Amino acid sequence: ASRGLGDVYKRQHQTNADRIGITRRQVKTVTYAFLYGAGNTKLGYSYDKLLSEKAAAVKGAEIRKAYIAAIPGLADLLLACEKASKRGYANAIDGRRISVDKGHKFLNYLLQGSAATIAKRWMVIVNECLPPDGHQLSFVHDELNYECYPRFAEEFAKWLETAARLAGEHYNLRCPIAAEAKIGYTWADVH
């Protein structure tokens, strides 16, 4: 049984593309540039590498404005990040302090730190109830891969999905955490 949160992200990328008026292919690159703290010029180049520097800065500003308008609460989050970045650290969802060296990186550190913490909690919960002779094979980014006897695969796949939800609940998140489990004999079968 295997699967991560990838399909959830794919759907969200399409939703963002539709809201902002860019293609699905562009939105993933642009979204990550935005979340990782790119300035307007870099954001514009993420949209189209062939733009002039001035045109990229203008396009980047348009994209930034569209994102902020399209995603409820984003403006407030960015303002809170700007204020909190002045102290030099972010408070992780598990209470740890994450050092932030530059203000424009604050949101990225907060998101990456939170995602890693949730994914690790997910792994811990899953491993508490492994099927007989079940083994974890890998943990890559937001994906857990396990092996087990075929007779346990369906039940274990359901447990993987439940454990993702429980990981989010562990941190009292307001947005649900979801995962989709897939069953196959090889890594390629589940991708």
What are these regions (language model features)?
Residues 15-139, 149-152, 180-191:
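Conserved catalytic core of nucleic-acid polymerases
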Residues 138-143, 174-176:
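Short Gly/Ser/Thr- and Asp/Glu-enriched loop/turn motifs at secondary-structure junctions
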Residues 156-164:
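Short amphipathic alpha-helices in soluble, non-transmembrane regions
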